[in-house]
Amino acid sequence: MSAGAITIGLDFGSDSVRALAVDCQSGKELETDVVYYPRWREGKYCQPANNQFRHHPLDYIESLEQAIKVVVSRLTNDQRQSIIGIGVDSTGSTPAPIDEQGQILALRPEFANNPNAMFVLWKDHTAIEEADAINALCRSGQFPDYTRYIGGVYSSEWFWAKILHVSREDAAVRQAAVSWIELCDWVPALLSGTQAPADIRRGRCSAGHKSLWHPSWCGLPPKDFLHALDPCLTETLQYPLFTDTWTAEQPVGSITAEWAQRLGIPETVTLAGGAFDCHVGTVGAGAQPYTLVKVIGTSTCDILIADEERIADRTIAGICGQVDGSVVPNYIGLEAGQSAFGDMYAWFGRLLGWSLQEAAKDHPELKTSLQAMEAKLLERLTHNWAENPTLDHLPIVLDWFNGRRTPFANQRLKGVITDLNLGTDAPTLFGGFIAATAFGARAIMECFEEQGVPVENVLALGGIARKSPVIMQVCTDVMNRPLQIVASDQCCALGAAIFAAVAAGVHGDIPTAQQHMASGIERTLMPDSQRVARYQQLYERYQQWCRLAEPAYSPTSTAKN
């Protein structure tokens, strides 16, 4: 091991990028910085009412540069010279179109303000019809079912659906793009100066979970499948977009001299391969096989790794993919998740906060006080409900406010609130929201277990997991499992730093690096036996409402409405 070696993990989230410097020997988190995307904060290029969420590539470039420079500036000179690697994770699927030089189209003047030329954020659901078309073709019998290793359902949140939607909608982008790239693959390519689309290393994680890549059909689906889906996919796009994939501990190259100078780090820094945030966060959390890791934020991503021998040739239905090496080499990475978790709470806060916002407009002198009240709304709701957590009249809420990711992805679904009466107050309704997110978490756990994939432990990480013990206790009671809370609140960036340590040769493999660098457990929550029984009844009612409500959002039903 290199004495004093330091790696930097870059974690690209929905709102911001985090840079974290980690000591590769002790695992000590040395310095960190978070930078919010400026254009995103202004709401540019997004239309929430139409489910359109886009990120301009300059938001990523400017923010990563600022974050790393701040982190590096806080290190000693010796520490700066000891930086030997950078690892990258990002949200996903978050792809963007690129030209022959590997440049994101939005970085060209003629596309600078075109949302279709930017990164299509994971939670963008403009491609629902395109996802339906992919699913229909996979089930038509004309081709093998290319969805069988991704749970049997292709989502509008994923790679090909988004490519197809933009290609159909925007002829200029369609003609200019020769390929598309995931954010987690683009950042290492950018920093290492890899430009030609054919030379860019594509990560196993993103390719296997979102791009229909699988060894059994030698990579991506064949060209005739894409042509049958829509000829626009074969007009100008290179085929195949890529063939080989790499696990994230593999190096993709060294940082360019220009970027090393801009960031103030050595030119010898190695770039690790990219992967999705939650898969990388699982490594940062130190997870072992058959531990269900819940990465909880605006949404959740649930990751479990399993032995290749145990999964064998079985396919696990209703999840978001089973990919060899997507988390740790030589293990199958299984992905699931909820399309909204913290976003549901935030929506409820905005709903109640509307009157405060209006009052601030009418009384500017009270604006600061009213904004402070609004910022405390969810905290007070949670505290109030926790003091009197009645379950006798708890509303049943379906956690589909941003569609459903697992089990069985369906982004047509909408949130549902039931069992209200004239006595339902705001804290009680918020309690229903908390229970709904916990019910969704249990449905994911059962999706694994009912198909013979054991869940031996449950870990939770992220801001909500560490800062909201009330919410986590509800999850514990609903799932009727001990719930371990991971100590680090930046596990994704930590995991990226772990991958960088292996890529740079500091550690020989991921398990060894985890022993030195992974986070510990902060505390373990235990189920309350009395509340477990009552939540069981409520969960059964939640499942009943799920069965009743889902048909109302079928394509034929929504068309009639």
Curated annotation (Swiss-Prot):
GO molecular function: ATP binding; D-ribulokinase activity; ribulokinase activity
UniProt cross-references to SUPFAM superfamilies, sorted A to Z: Actin-like ATPase domain
Reactions mediated catalytically: D-ribulose + ATP = D-ribulose 5-phosphate + ADP + H(+); L-ribulose + ATP = L-ribulose 5-phosphate + ADP + H(+)
Gene3D superfamilies in alphabetical order: 1.20.58.2240, 3.30.420.40
Pathway the protein takes part in: Carbohydrate degradation; L-arabinose degradation via L-ribulose; D-xylulose 5-phosphate from L-arabinose (bacterial route): step 2/3
Keyword terms: Arabinose catabolism, ATP-binding, Carbohydrate metabolism, Kinase, Nucleotide-binding, Transferase
GO cellular component terms given for this protein: cytoplasm
Cleaved signal peptide residues: none
Enzyme Commission number(s) of this protein: 2.7.1.16
Record Pfam families: FGGY_C (PF02782)
GO annotation (BP), single: L-arabinose catabolic process to xylulose 5-phosphate
Family matches, as InterPro entries: ATPase_NBD, Carb_kinase_FGGY, FGGY_C, Ribulokinase
Entry-linked HAMAP family: Ribulokinase (MF_00520)
Record family assignment: Belongs to the ribulokinase family.
UniProt protein name: Ribulokinase
Source organism (scientific name): Pectobacterium atrosepticum (strain SCRI 1043 / ATCC BAA-672) (Erwinia carotovora subsp. atroseptica)
